[in-house]
Amino acid sequence: GREAAKPVKLAAAHRTANLLMKILILGAGQVGSTAAYHLAREEANEVTIIDSNPTVLRDLQDRLDVRTVLGHAASPGTLERAGCANMDMVIALTSSDEVNMIACQVAHTLFSTPTKIARVRSSEYISKPELFGTDRIPVDLCISPEQLVTRHIEQLIRYPGAFQVLDFRSEERRVGKECRSRW
Protein backbone atom coordinates (compact mmCIF):
# COMPACT_ATOMS: atom_id res chain seq x y z
CA GLY A 1 0.00 0.00 0.00
CA ARG A 2 0.94 3.64 -0.29
CA GLU A 3 2.15 5.66 2.65
CA ALA A 4 0.36 8.82 3.73
CA ALA A 5 3.69 10.66 3.45
CA LYS A 6 3.88 9.97 -0.32
CA PRO A 7 2.55 13.43 -1.34
CA VAL A 8 5.29 15.14 0.67
CA LYS A 9 7.99 12.94 -0.85
CA LEU A 10 6.64 13.60 -4.35
CA ALA A 11 6.55 17.35 -3.75
CA ALA A 12 10.08 17.35 -2.36
CA ALA A 13 11.40 15.37 -5.35
CA HIS A 14 9.87 17.84 -7.79
CA ARG A 15 11.17 20.88 -5.96
CA THR A 16 14.67 19.43 -5.74
CA ALA A 17 14.72 18.75 -9.49
CA ASN A 18 13.33 22.28 -10.07
CA LEU A 19 10.37 20.92 -12.04
CA LEU A 20 6.78 22.07 -12.00
CA MET A 21 4.42 20.20 -9.73
CA LYS A 22 1.26 19.69 -11.81
CA ILE A 23 -1.73 19.77 -9.48
CA LEU A 24 -5.37 19.18 -10.42
CA ILE A 25 -7.93 20.54 -7.95
CA LEU A 26 -11.47 19.22 -8.20
CA GLY A 27 -14.07 21.64 -6.87
CA ALA A 28 -13.84 25.42 -6.70
CA GLY A 29 -15.90 25.97 -3.56
CA GLN A 30 -14.48 27.57 -0.42
CA VAL A 31 -11.95 24.81 0.29
CA GLY A 32 -10.95 24.28 -3.35
CA SER A 33 -10.57 28.00 -4.05
CA THR A 34 -8.47 28.49 -0.93
CA ALA A 35 -6.23 25.55 -1.85
CA ALA A 36 -5.88 26.91 -5.40
CA TYR A 37 -4.97 30.35 -4.07
CA HIS A 38 -2.19 29.01 -1.84
CA LEU A 39 -0.84 26.45 -4.31
CA ALA A 40 -0.89 28.83 -7.32
CA ARG A 41 1.19 31.39 -5.40
CA GLU A 42 4.17 29.04 -5.49
CA GLU A 43 6.12 29.24 -8.75
CA ALA A 44 6.91 25.52 -8.60
CA ASN A 45 3.21 24.64 -8.97
CA GLU A 46 1.07 24.52 -12.09
CA VAL A 47 -2.56 24.41 -10.97
CA THR A 48 -5.65 23.34 -12.93
CA ILE A 49 -9.14 23.53 -11.40
CA ILE A 50 -12.27 21.63 -12.44
CA ASP A 51 -15.73 22.85 -11.44
CA SER A 52 -19.25 22.81 -12.88
CA ASN A 53 -19.86 26.53 -12.21
CA PRO A 54 -18.55 28.73 -15.06
CA THR A 55 -18.91 31.96 -13.04
CA VAL A 56 -16.72 30.68 -10.21
CA LEU A 57 -14.12 29.43 -12.70
CA ARG A 58 -14.01 32.81 -14.50
CA ASP A 59 -13.53 34.59 -11.18
CA LEU A 60 -10.67 32.27 -10.20
CA GLN A 61 -9.02 32.65 -13.59
CA ASP A 62 -9.21 36.45 -13.27
CA ARG A 63 -7.62 36.41 -9.80
CA LEU A 64 -5.11 33.55 -10.02
CA ASP A 65 -2.57 32.11 -12.42
CA VAL A 66 -4.50 28.86 -12.94
CA ARG A 67 -6.05 26.90 -15.78
CA THR A 68 -9.75 26.09 -15.42
CA VAL A 69 -11.87 23.32 -16.92
CA LEU A 70 -15.67 23.32 -16.86
CA GLY A 71 -17.23 19.94 -16.08
CA HIS A 72 -18.08 17.26 -13.53
CA ALA A 73 -15.17 16.42 -11.22
CA ALA A 74 -15.47 12.62 -11.52
CA SER A 75 -16.17 12.48 -15.26
CA PRO A 76 -13.48 10.63 -17.23
CA GLY A 77 -13.93 13.06 -20.14
CA THR A 78 -13.55 16.12 -17.92
CA LEU A 79 -10.48 14.66 -16.21
CA GLU A 80 -8.98 13.88 -19.62
CA ARG A 81 -9.61 17.45 -20.88
CA ALA A 82 -7.92 18.74 -17.72
CA GLY A 83 -4.80 16.71 -18.50
CA CYS A 84 -5.15 14.25 -15.64
CA ALA A 85 -2.72 11.83 -17.35
CA ASN A 86 0.07 14.40 -16.88
CA MET A 87 -0.78 15.45 -13.33
CA ASP A 88 1.44 14.68 -10.36
CA MET A 89 -1.40 15.09 -7.89
CA VAL A 90 -5.20 15.20 -7.81
CA ILE A 91 -6.83 16.96 -4.86
CA ALA A 92 -10.57 16.24 -4.78
CA LEU A 93 -12.26 18.98 -2.75
CA THR A 94 -15.89 18.99 -3.89
CA SER A 95 -18.68 19.08 -1.31
CA SER A 96 -19.47 15.40 -2.00
CA ASP A 97 -17.41 12.65 -0.35
CA GLU A 98 -18.60 10.17 -2.94
CA VAL A 99 -17.66 12.37 -5.91
CA ASN A 100 -14.23 12.93 -4.35
CA MET A 101 -13.61 9.21 -3.86
CA ILE A 102 -14.88 8.25 -7.33
CA ALA A 103 -12.76 11.01 -8.91
CA CYS A 104 -9.68 9.55 -7.20
CA GLN A 105 -10.65 6.09 -8.47
CA VAL A 106 -10.99 7.40 -12.05
CA ALA A 107 -7.69 9.32 -11.79
CA HIS A 108 -5.97 6.16 -10.54
CA THR A 109 -7.53 3.63 -12.92
CA LEU A 110 -7.63 5.60 -16.17
CA PHE A 111 -4.78 8.09 -15.77
CA SER A 112 -2.35 6.50 -13.25
CA THR A 113 -2.15 9.73 -11.25
CA PRO A 114 0.57 9.11 -8.64
CA THR A 115 -0.90 11.02 -5.68
CA LYS A 116 -4.58 11.32 -4.85
CA ILE A 117 -5.94 13.39 -1.96
CA ALA A 118 -9.65 13.53 -1.13
CA ARG A 119 -11.73 15.70 1.15
CA VAL A 120 -13.86 13.22 3.09
CA ARG A 121 -16.21 14.79 5.61
CA SER A 122 -18.24 11.81 6.81
CA SER A 123 -16.86 9.98 9.83
CA GLU A 124 -18.56 6.89 8.39
CA TYR A 125 -15.79 6.73 5.77
CA ILE A 126 -12.93 8.21 7.79
CA SER A 127 -13.44 5.75 10.66
CA LYS A 128 -12.85 2.84 8.25
CA PRO A 129 -9.26 3.19 6.97
CA GLU A 130 -9.47 -0.31 5.45
CA LEU A 131 -11.62 1.24 2.68
CA PHE A 132 -8.61 3.08 1.31
CA GLY A 133 -5.56 1.73 -0.48
CA THR A 134 -4.17 1.05 -3.94
CA ASP A 135 -6.30 -2.10 -4.36
CA ARG A 136 -9.35 -0.49 -2.72
CA ILE A 137 -10.47 3.14 -3.00
CA PRO A 138 -7.17 4.65 -4.15
CA VAL A 139 -6.96 7.71 -1.91
CA ASP A 140 -3.48 8.35 -0.54
CA LEU A 141 -4.61 10.94 1.99
CA CYS A 142 -8.07 11.78 3.34
CA ILE A 143 -8.50 15.30 4.67
CA SER A 144 -11.40 16.65 6.68
CA PRO A 145 -11.22 20.39 7.43
CA GLU A 146 -14.33 20.07 9.59
CA GLN A 147 -12.76 17.40 11.80
CA LEU A 148 -9.54 19.41 12.09
CA VAL A 149 -11.48 22.44 13.30
CA THR A 150 -13.50 20.31 15.73
CA ARG A 151 -10.30 18.73 17.13
CA HIS A 152 -8.72 22.17 17.48
CA ILE A 153 -11.73 23.53 19.40
CA GLU A 154 -11.78 20.46 21.68
CA GLN A 155 -8.10 21.03 22.51
CA LEU A 156 -8.68 24.71 23.24
CA ILE A 157 -11.51 23.78 25.61
CA ARG A 158 -9.26 21.23 27.35
CA TYR A 159 -6.46 23.80 27.71
CA PRO A 160 -8.08 27.16 28.54
CA GLY A 161 -5.92 30.19 27.81
CA ALA A 162 -4.02 28.47 24.99
CA PHE A 163 -4.65 29.71 21.47
CA GLN A 164 -2.83 26.75 19.96
CA VAL A 165 -2.14 23.26 21.27
CA LEU A 166 0.44 21.05 19.56
CA ASP A 167 0.65 17.27 19.93
CA PHE A 168 4.00 15.51 19.98
CA ARG A 169 4.56 11.75 19.79
CA SER A 170 0.95 10.57 19.77
CA GLU A 171 -0.30 12.97 22.42
CA GLU A 172 2.36 11.94 25.00
CA ARG A 173 3.33 15.59 25.32
CA ARG A 174 1.23 18.67 24.78
CA VAL A 175 2.45 22.21 24.37
CA GLY A 176 0.10 25.15 24.62
CA LYS A 177 1.01 28.78 24.44
CA GLU A 178 -1.03 31.42 26.17
CA CYS A 179 -1.10 34.86 24.62
CA ARG A 180 -2.64 37.81 26.37
CA SER A 181 -2.96 41.13 24.67
CA ARG A 182 -1.19 44.03 26.34
CA TRP A 183 -3.32 47.04 27.21
Residue ranges of each PLM-predicted region?
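Cytosolic regulatory regions of ion transport systems
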Residues: 10-181
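Intrinsic disorder/low-complexity segments enriched in small, polar and charged residues
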Residues: 4-6
